[in-house]
């Protein structure tokens, strides 16, 4: 039906007769001439109808936005004065000789001239995807997956599929369950990741595996989360953690070079402890120049309990955050930031405005100045590198609250005051995470997952002091987003059972849930390690959007619903009966 795409026509096509298929993007009727912008997935081209082709001109008068049409015509060069430098096809136009209206369009529920609500865009997603910017994002996503496959193939990785219907395992989020008709009362789980299957593939001898795979997590959603998402899943045997990172870093550098024409350079490596200490986050945005600076040792003796208490508490912390040019902030803005940090558990926000360093205490403005000596103020200013016109905010509490509050404040200030370099790419690796964290109920939970190996510890050492264990894990972070994470896996049965025990999984439960894994570990398991990238998040970064729904063709809402198909929906009673399922309605509160 077509010979060319609209958006691919150039001066090299001048004089050629072409047939185009697509949609009316815009129509301009000048009486004796009608111009339309005709659009397909590759872009837009101007088509015009003149009186010499009367039948085509007459039919063109009926055209409206989003009519699906076929046009045959001749490519012509535009006059110099009519060249449109903003269009890829702006040097040419098509003189139509024939027009076919394939399908007409009703009045559109989306307005191309206004910003539509996200609800409307998701309900009429098939129309939203016609927009050039949406089409471009999905084309970029397709390019990324193609680049990934070629890279992995070139590096000896095998693309192997793993099951979608599997067994529920604890991985930190709720499973989506699928009832079995054959085995009534039993359920499959949709995989949160192919974690155990890819480890079993390593035990099977496939030493380099990858898969671009759908995963499912029934969890509360955020702007960058979806209930179903796509991973670039990778596992290797006989490779150390640095070797895995080297290959995966090369993959990401390849993507940025091919898609953005950007050389990311070598990725710095930072420990979890350093990232939390300097940036208050395990996924620091290094485009932001501000850092948290410890000042507890300077404040242990001050007669101000808000500072002195945490400064003298081994579990406490007092940190300062220097804000370049922050002295310009108004009292209302400061109060707003004080309320902001309370979201993260902080009780308030002490500060020092640096007006004139040379004047000591007389050169600052601070509600806590009366508790500080000239020597302490000068030491704080020196340690933070404060200059005239800067602001210093303080966090004083337990270590987690200080990191969370000042880390979030750092990001917000970076955006509000334009301190974060939005034109920069800042990748890094974060390594050496704690293996376990407090579950809030007196027990421990795995910070990554229960199959991650500890660094430099035997099973007996781990059992004796699990709180000291460091995971042989690594996350890739770009511009404050965790785009991938992985670890060296446990390849020893004793170590795996020890970890299960620390997590409160007794031997009977271990056999019920992971018996197949524990059995497999008995038969010559190789050392193995892997990683998974979030394809959706990578695409989000590479296309410059801040909403992950913009890079998924048919995404869910933050309530895990599809507004277009109205899923999820109620099942009919016959289907439920066949599955042996009874729906119990919650009693309404009186």
Curated annotation (Swiss-Prot):
Biological processes, Gene Ontology terms: aspartyl-tRNA aminoacylation
The record's subcellular locations are: Cytoplasm
Question: Which Gene Ontology MF annotations are present?
Answer: aspartate-tRNA ligase activity; ATP binding; nucleic acid binding
UniProt-listed Pfam families: GAD (PF02938), tRNA-synt_2 (PF00152), tRNA_anti-codon (PF01336)
Name the CDD domains for this protein. AspRS_core, EcAspRS_like_N
Question: Which keywords does the record carry?
Answer: Aminoacyl-tRNA synthetase, ATP-binding, Cytoplasm, Ligase, Nucleotide-binding, Protein biosynthesis
A GO CC annotation given for this chain = cytoplasm
Any idea of its EC number?
6.1.1.12
Binding of L-aspartate, residues? 171, 217, 448, 489
InterPro entries of this UniProt entry?
Answer: Aa-tRNA-synt_II (IPR004364), aa-tRNA-synth_II (IPR006195), aa-tRNA-synth_II/BPL/LPL (IPR045864), Asp-tRNA-ligase_1 (IPR004524), Asp-tRNA-ligase_1_N (IPR047089), Asp/Asn-tRNA-synth_IIb (IPR002312), AspRS_core (IPR047090), GAD-like_sf (IPR004115)
Residues binding ATP are 217-219, 226, 482, 534-537
Reaction(s) catalysed by this chain, per the record, are: tRNA(Asp) + L-aspartate + ATP = L-aspartyl-tRNA(Asp) + AMP + diphosphate
Q: Tell me the PROSITE patterns matching this sequence.
A: AA_TRNA_LIGASE_II (PS50862)
Chief localisation class: cytoplasm
Q: Where is this region: Aspartate?
A: 195-198
- Known role: Catalyzes the attachment of L-aspartate to tRNA(Asp) in a two-step reaction: L-aspartate is first activated by ATP to form Asp-AMP and then transferred to the acceptor end of tRNA(Asp).
- Similarity comment: Belongs to the class-II aminoacyl-tRNA synthetase family. Type 1 subfamily.
Q: Supply the HAMAP family for this chain.
A: Asp_tRNA_synth_type1 (MF_00044)
Q: How does it assemble?
A: Homodimer.
Q: What is this protein called?
A: Aspartate--tRNA ligase
Q: Which organism is it from?
A: Salmonella arizonae (strain ATCC BAA-731 / CDC346-86 / RSK2980)
């Amino acid at each position: 039906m077509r010979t060319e795409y609209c958006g691919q026509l150039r001066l090299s096509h001048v004089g050629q007769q072409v047939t185009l298929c697509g949609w009316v993007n815009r129509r301009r009727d000048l009486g004796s001439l009608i111009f339309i912008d005709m659009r397909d997935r590759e872009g837009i081209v101007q088509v015009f109808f003149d009186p010499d082709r009367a039948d085509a001109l007459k039919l063109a008068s009926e055209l409206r936005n989003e009519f699906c049409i076929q046009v045959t015509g001749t490519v012509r060069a535009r006059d110099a004065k009519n060249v449109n430098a903003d269009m890829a096809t702006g040097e040419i136009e098509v003189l139509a000789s024939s027009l076919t209206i394939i399908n007409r369009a009703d009045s559109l529920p989306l307005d191309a001239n206004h910003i539509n609500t996200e609800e409307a865009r998701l309900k009429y997603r098939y129309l939203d995807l016609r927009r050039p910017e949406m089409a471009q994002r999905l084309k970029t996503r397709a390019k990324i997956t193609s680049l990934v496959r070629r890279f992995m193939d070139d590096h000896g990785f095998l693309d192997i599929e793993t099951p979608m219907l599997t067994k529920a395992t604890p991985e930190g989020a709720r499973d989506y369950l699928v009832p079995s008709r054959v085995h009534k009362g039993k359920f499959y789980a949709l995989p949160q990741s192919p974690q155990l299957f890819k480890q079993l593939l390593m035990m099977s001898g496939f030493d380099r595996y990858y898969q671009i795979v759908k995963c499912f997590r029934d969890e509360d959603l955020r702007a960058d989360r979806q209930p179903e998402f796509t991973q670039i899943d990778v596992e290797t045997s006989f490779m150390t953690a640095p070797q895995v990172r080297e290959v995966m870093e090369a993959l990401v550098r390849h993507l940025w070079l091919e898609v953005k024409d950007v050389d990311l350079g070598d990725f710095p490596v930072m420990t979890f402890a350093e990232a939390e200490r300097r940036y208050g986050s395990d996924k620091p945005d290094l485009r932001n120049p501000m850092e948290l600076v410890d000042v507890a040792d300077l404040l242990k003796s001050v007669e101000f309990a808000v500072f002195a208490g945490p400064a003298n508490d081994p579990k406490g912390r007092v940190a300062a955050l220097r804000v370049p040019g922050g002295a310009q902030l108004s009292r209302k803005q400061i109060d707003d930031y004080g309320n902001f940090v309370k979201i993260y558990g902080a009780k308030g926000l002490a500060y020092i405005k640096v007006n004139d360093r040379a004047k000591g205490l007389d050169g600052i403005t601070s509600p806590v100045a009366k508790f500080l000596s000239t020597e302490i103020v000068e030491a704080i200013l020196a340690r933070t590198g404060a200059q005239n016109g800067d602001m210093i905010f303080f966090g004083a509490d337990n270590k987690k609250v200080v990191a969370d509050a000042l880390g979030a404040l750092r990001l917000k200030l970076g955006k509000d005051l334009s301190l974060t370099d939005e034109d920069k790419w800042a990748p890094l690796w974060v390594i050496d995470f704690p293996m376990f964290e407090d579950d809030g109920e007196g027990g421990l939970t795995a910070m990554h997952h229960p199959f991650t190996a500890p660094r430099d510890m035997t099973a007996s050492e781990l059992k004796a002091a699990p709180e000291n264990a460091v995971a042989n894990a690594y996350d890739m972070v770009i511009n404050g987003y965790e785009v991938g994470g992985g670890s060296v896996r446990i390849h020893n049965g004793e170590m795996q059972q020890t970890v299960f025990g620390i997590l409160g999984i007794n031997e009977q439960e271990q056999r019920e849930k992971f018996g197949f894994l524990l059995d497999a570990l008995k038969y010559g398991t190789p050392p193995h390690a892997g990683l998974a990238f979030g394809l959706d998040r990578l695409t989000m970064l590479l296309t410059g959007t801040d909403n992950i729904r913009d890079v998924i063709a048919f995404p869910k809402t933050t309530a895990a619903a599809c507004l277009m198909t109205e899923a999820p929906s109620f099942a009919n009673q016959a289907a439920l009966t066949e599955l042996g399922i009874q729906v119990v309605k919650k009693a309404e509160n009186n």
